[in-house]
Regions:
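Ligand-binding loop in jelly-roll beta-barrel domains
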Residues: 93-119
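A short, N-terminal "cap"/entry segment at the start of jelly-roll beta-barrel domains
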Residues: 1-40
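Histidine-centered metal-chelating micro-motifs
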Residues: 53-55, 73, 89, 93-99
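Short acidic-glycine-tyrosine-enriched beta hairpin
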Residues: 79-93
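Short histidine-centered beta-strand/loop micro-motifs
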Residues: 34, 53-59, 100-102
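Conserved short histidine dyad/triad with adjacent acidic residue
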Residues: 44-59, 93
Length: 119
């Protein structure tokens, strides 16, 4: 692990426009990862445009989420949960989930996953 730590601003990190089946209007920034000294973990920031969404999917790793701004829903195991700035969630490994921005507002959320979960 880095001795110095990391302090930065999201606006200084390049946005990767996500593409693929079930992805609409999603950008990703990798804020902290093993490259910055956080071995085994990755903290990403996702920006979902109004009406956009991540794919409905599951995977073999958990993730922790915190909503930085905006509004939307998190679908987990067949139920939609409202999200707004300050909301947080833990999605266990293997649980089907999807983030959706409101039709009239974007959604920005932090997602922390094990290193192998960042793709």
């Amino acid at each position: 692990m880095s001795e110095a730590g990391v302090v930065g601003n999201k606006d200084d990190v390049a946005v990767v426009v996500m593409s693929g089946e079930g992805i609409v209007e999603v950008g990703k920034r990798v804020l902290v990862s093993p490259a910055e000294g956080w071995d085994g973990w990755v903290m990403r920031l996702f920006d979902v445009g109004p009406g956009g969404h991540t794919p409905r999917h599951s995977h073999p790793w958990p993730h922790i989420n915190f909503v930085a701004s905006g509004r939307g829903t998190l679908f987990v195991d067949g139920a939609d949960h409202p999200l707004e700035a300050g909301s947080y969630a833990y999605v266990p490994a293997g649980h089907e989930h999807q983030f959706r921005a409101a039709m009239d507002a974007p959604l920005s959320f932090v997602c922390i996953v094990p290193e192998g979960g960042d793709y």
